[in-house]
Amino acid sequence: MEGILFLAKLPEAYAIFKPIIDVAPVIPVFFLLLAFVWQAAVGFR
């Protein structure tokens, strides 16, 4: 919870990193999809 409050009060200097912070939680899902596509490509050996 403190992390959310910290991110809400980010200094202006870090404003350019805000899109990266917004996208960060989605990255593990992309890895999961990548693993599935890879297994489909090799035929689920």
From Swiss-Prot:
- Protein role: One of the components of the core complex of photosystem II (PSII). PSII is a light-driven water:plastoquinone oxidoreductase that uses light energy to abstract electrons from H(2)O, generating O(2) and a proton gradient subsequently used for ATP formation. It consists of a core antenna complex that captures photons, and an electron transfer chain that converts photonic excitation into a charge separation.
Assembly and interaction partners: PSII is composed of 1 copy each of membrane proteins PsbA, PsbB, PsbC, PsbD, PsbE, PsbF, PsbH, PsbI, PsbJ, PsbK, PsbL, PsbM, PsbT, PsbX, PsbY, PsbZ, Psb30/Ycf12, at least 3 peripheral proteins of the oxygen-evolving complex and a large number of cofactors. It forms dimeric complexes.
PANTHER family according to UniProt: PHOTOSYSTEM II REACTION CENTER PROTEIN K, PTHR35325
Q: Which family does it belong to?
A: Belongs to the PsbK family.
Topology in the lipid bilayer: Single-pass membrane protein
The subcellular location is: Plastid, Chloroplast thylakoid membrane
Q: What's a single GO CC term here?
A: chloroplast thylakoid membrane
Organism (species): Guillardia theta
Q: Which HAMAP family match?
A: PSII_PsbK
The entry's keywords: Chloroplast, Membrane, Photosynthesis, Photosystem II, Plastid, Reaction center, Thylakoid, Transmembrane, Transmembrane helix
Enumerate the propeptide ranges: 1-8
- According to its UniProt record, where is this protein mainly located? plastid
Q: Which InterPro entries match?
A: PSII_PsbK (IPR003687), PSII_PsbK_sf (IPR037270)
The molecule here is called: Photosystem II reaction center protein K
Listed transmembrane segments = 24-44
Q: Which SUPFAM superfamilies match?
A: Photosystem II reaction center protein K, PsbK (SSF161037)
UniProt record, GO biological process: photosynthesis
